[in-house]
Amino acid sequence: MDFLMSKHEADAPHLLIVEARFYDDLADALLDGAKAALDEAGATYDVVTVPGALEIPATISFALDGADNGGTEYDGFVALGTVIRGETYHFDIVSNESCRALTDLSVEESIAIGNGILTVENEEQAWVRARREDKDKGGFAARAALTMIGLRKKFGA
């Protein structure tokens, strides 16, 4: 399995898409929307895959640490994944903690993150949100990250 795919051109915003592949087909749809939005905007990106939504914030933190040590610097991040409610409390933990950790990272590190982690009751709701022809939440998250990159630059952060 390739854990890093790259599309990179000079002088364009460069983002890291971190996708949780717990539900492969839904992950494909979210990623398709995010990549299309970034391509349309002329942005470049790398894609890394993680097992689930809880691993997304840590991966972004790894990327930030790597940049501090001479690795790739990213202008922003796109978090993609799907959490579907089951019969246990696990849904609430994953939904709340992944969102909280992304918010903490964005505020504490002053970074642009587009949150495209779907938190839904069932697979039908997930598909409506993931498909580009419906709500296109992958594309929405990518556009949100680009907007936040612009605001960060505007304020000189």
UniProtKB/Swiss-Prot annotation:
Top-level enzyme category:
transferase
Q: Which PANTHER family match?
A: 6,7-DIMETHYL-8-RIBITYLLUMAZINE SYNTHASE, 6,7-DIMETHYL-8-RIBITYLLUMAZINE SYNTHASE DMRL SYNTHASE LUMAZINE SYNTHASE
What is the primary gene name for this protein?
A: ribH1
Q: Induced by what?
A: The two ribH genes may be differentially expressed during the Brucella infection cycle. Brucella would use RibH1 for flavin biosynthesis during the extracellular phase and RibH2 during intracellular growth.
- Gene Ontology process terms (BP): riboflavin biosynthetic process
Q: Which residues bind (2S)-2-hydroxy-3-oxobutyl phosphate?
A: 87-88, 129
Return the GO cellular component terms, semicolon-separated: cytosol; riboflavin synthase complex
Catalytic activity, as annotated: (2S)-2-hydroxy-3-oxobutyl phosphate + 5-amino-6-(D-ribitylamino)uracil = 6,7-dimethyl-8-(1-D-ribityl)lumazine + phosphate + 2 H2O + H(+)
The record describes the protein's role as: Catalyzes the formation of 6,7-dimethyl-8-ribityllumazine by condensation of 5-amino-6-(D-ribitylamino)uracil with 3,4-dihydroxy-2-butanone 4-phosphate. This is the penultimate step in the biosynthesis of riboflavin.
Instruction: Identify the metabolic or biological route this protein is part of.
Output: Cofactor biosynthesis; riboflavin biosynthesis; riboflavin from 2-hydroxy-3-oxobutyl phosphate and 5-amino-6-(D-ribitylamino)uracil: step 1/2
Instruction: Tell whether Transferase is among the UniProt keywords.
Output: yes
| Higher taxonomy | Bacteria, Pseudomonadati, Pseudomonadota, Alphaproteobacteria, Hyphomicrobiales
List UniProt keywords, sorted A-Z. Answer: Riboflavin biosynthesis, Transferase
Species this protein is from: Brucella suis biovar 1 (strain 1330)
Which residues does the entry assign to the active site, renumbered to this chain? Answer: 90 (proton donor)
Domain of life, source organism: Bacteria
By sequence similarity, the record places it as follows: Belongs to the DMRL synthase family.
Which residues does 5-amino-6-(D-ribitylamino)uracil bind?
A: 22, 53-55, 82-84, 115
Q: What is this protein called?
A: 6,7-dimethyl-8-ribityllumazine synthase 1
GO MF terms here are:
6,7-dimethyl-8-ribityllumazine synthase activity
For this protein, what is the EC number?
A: 2.5.1.78
